[in-house]
Amino acid sequence: MERFKLNTTLSYLVAVSGGPDSMFMLNELIKMNIKEIVVCHVNYNFREDSWKDQKLVEDFCLKNNLKLEKLIINQDYSKLKENFESWARNIRYDFFVEISKKYNIQNVLIAHNRNDLVETFLLQQDRKGYVKHYGLNKTSTYKEITIVRPMLNILKSEILKSLKEENIAFVIDSTNEDKKYKRNKIRANLSESTFNDFEETIKKLNKKLEIINLEVNWYVNNNMSADELKINKNLQDQDLEFIQRTIYKWLEVIKKDFVIQNRRNKTIFEIAKNIKVSEKVFWEINIGEYSIIKDYENLFIIETKAIQPKTILIKSKEDLYLSEEFINWLDLLNAIKRNKENYPYVITNDFLTYKLNTYTFGKKTNRYLIDKKIRYKNRMLKAVVYSTKTKKILNTIK
């Protein structure tokens, strides 16, 4: 009898650690005549005996003629500055994305069970942070892949019983007993007999979330321009939870939600709070390799390296090729030609500096930028060119 339902005409990547849950799932999958299975295993070398996990998975795949992709990590964990669980999850899921591209398989099976669902809910309650979905969702996305959890209706006790009956080997991760991890503390005090009550609470909370998310979806769908989110009074008048959900939804729509996955809740809270209370027309919040920027009534996300200030001195015609670093390079060249190539010139997108020491249409550039409400996005991405002699900006800022 099939323990869970899957479309057997599809191909799947299967995340297998060697623990009881993933070994149970893999053992059940090979009974189902699925089109294609590719096993994915990550050895973090976090424990001295982690090679045993890898060996177990290798032997099982060899015995059952299964494709296996491995990622072996060599990391000095004494130098790891971020939370291990979040770091490991990113490593693991990015590996799935890589293997997904290699085999052209979109779906990844994860062996979360019914116990994990309840434990996750209790962790969410304890942390009191942003919750996208209470408990665990049957499906979710990470970058280009779909995460599928087919075992959320199966108890841990059922899994262990099945493994024993079928004589399937598995390993126990010793860190699962370490009480310094909050999930392990919760697990130690949980009884499967209480799960029905917890699941009823989870259902009720998720129904409330559905109503809120309908409103969030409506706002995002009706207030987007290209990949930017419009900020208006309707959003600013909402509570911080609604604004946070709106940010998440917007990033999800433009496929940039991976930027904030596993980030501390205070990052999104800070963005939401700025939207609600800040009267500034411009602010920037850095999130790793990306920045989220408020630009008048617009919110956009961009790679931080794309908006780094650059300044180039053009001493002669031979230096003109340097202007190609900027997206509006042709505009810059035409401006220099109109000025009869009266070298030297400065080309820069460092608007915080040039706005104070240059002139545009007879007024200080800072005043011009304010009066014309020139978008900060354009100031950062597009360069200006001015003569070092007159300090007059030669191209049109728009």
From Swiss-Prot:
It is found in: Cytoplasm. Its main location: cytoplasm. GO terms for biological process: tRNA modification. ATP binds at S17, G18, G19, P20, D21, S22. It holds the Pfam family ATP_bind_3. GO terms for cellular component: cytoplasm. CDD domains: TilS_N (cd01992). SUPFAM superfamilies: Adenine nucleotide alpha hydrolases-like. InterPro entries: Rossmann-like_a/b/a_fold, TilS/TtcA_N, tRNA_Ile_lys_synt, tRNA_Ile_lys_synt_N. GO terms for molecular function: ATP binding; tRNA(Ile)-lysidine synthase activity. Its EC number is 6.3.4.19. Keywords: ATP-binding, Cytoplasm, Ligase, Nucleotide-binding, tRNA processing. It catalyses: cytidine(34) in tRNA(Ile2) + L-lysine + ATP = lysidine(34) in tRNA(Ile2) + AMP + diphosphate + H(+). The keyword Transcription regulation does not apply. HAMAP family: tRNA_Ile_lys_synt. The N-terminal region contains the highly conserved SGGXDS motif, predicted to be a P-loop motif involved in ATP binding. Belongs to the tRNA(Ile)-lysidine synthase family. Ligates lysine onto the cytidine present at position 34 of the AUA codon-specific tRNA(Ile) that contains the anticodon CAU, in an ATP-dependent manner. Cytidine is converted to lysidine, thus changing the amino acid specificity of the tRNA from methionine to isoleucine. This is tRNA(Ile)-lysidine synthase. It comes from Mesoplasma florum (strain ATCC 33453 / NBRC 100688 / NCTC 11704 / L1) (Acholeplasma florum). The gene is tilS.
